[in-house]
């Protein structure tokens, strides 16, 4: 039993750290926009064709929440979460009251963008950095609270400590 708990804790720590790492790698060297003004085609983003299919809808939905400048982060999250596959490409409907038939990519994107916008607002209010927001997308909004009283900036060690506190 102790070994199973250890494995679960390790996975709780490693997966979100992996998610943040992949998002960071995907965004390294990415300019804010390509030459034609399109952040989806900016060099280095490495999006699958499936994720690119959702780019316009993600951008439109982000604009509705006044977070259009975070479109590339949302697309990177989708790429890491599912590669754009399935009815929940943002992995945002797991705890929703929707039936499997009601879960659609558009509902997933709407829920994810709304959640990301809320996380951005919370981080802004508490003075936390964008990396904390990205990590909180996976860990939950409580990670921003946790970060806000521990230096306000996401670090690898902070995310490990947070994950360990949940085991």
Per-region residue spans from a language model:
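Membrane-interface motif at the C-terminal end of an N-terminal transmembrane signal
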Residues: 17-34
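Residue-level detector of well-ordered alpha-helical segments, enriched
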Residues: 69-74, 88-89, 129, 133
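Catalytic and substrate-binding regions of cell-wall glycan-acting enzymes that process beta-1,4-linked
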Residues: 96, 107, 136-167
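Active-site/pore-lining binding-face segments in mid-to-C-terminal subdomains
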Residues: 118, 122-147
């Amino acid at each position: 039993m102790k070994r199973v708990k250890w494995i679960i804790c390790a996975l709780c720590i490693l997966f979100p750290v992996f998610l943040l790492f992949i998002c960071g790698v995907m965004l390294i060297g990415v300019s804010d926009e390509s030459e034609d003004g399109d952040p989806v085609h900016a060099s280095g983003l490495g999006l699958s064709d499936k994720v690119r299919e959702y780019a316009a809808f993600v951008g439109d939905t982000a604009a509705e929440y006044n977070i259009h400048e975070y479109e590339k982060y949302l697309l990177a999250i989708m790429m890491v979460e599912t590669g754009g596959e399935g009815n929940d490409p943002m992995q945002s409907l797991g705890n929703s009251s929707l039936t499997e038939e009601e879960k659609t990519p558009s509902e997933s994107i709407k829920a994810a963008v709304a959640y990301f916008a809320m996380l951005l607002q919370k981080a802004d209010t508490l003075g936390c950095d964008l990396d904390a927001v990205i990590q909180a997308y996976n860990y939950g909004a409580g990670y921003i609270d946790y970060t806000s009283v521990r230096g306000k900036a996401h670090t690898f060690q902070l995310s490990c400590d947070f994950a360990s506190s949940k085991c």
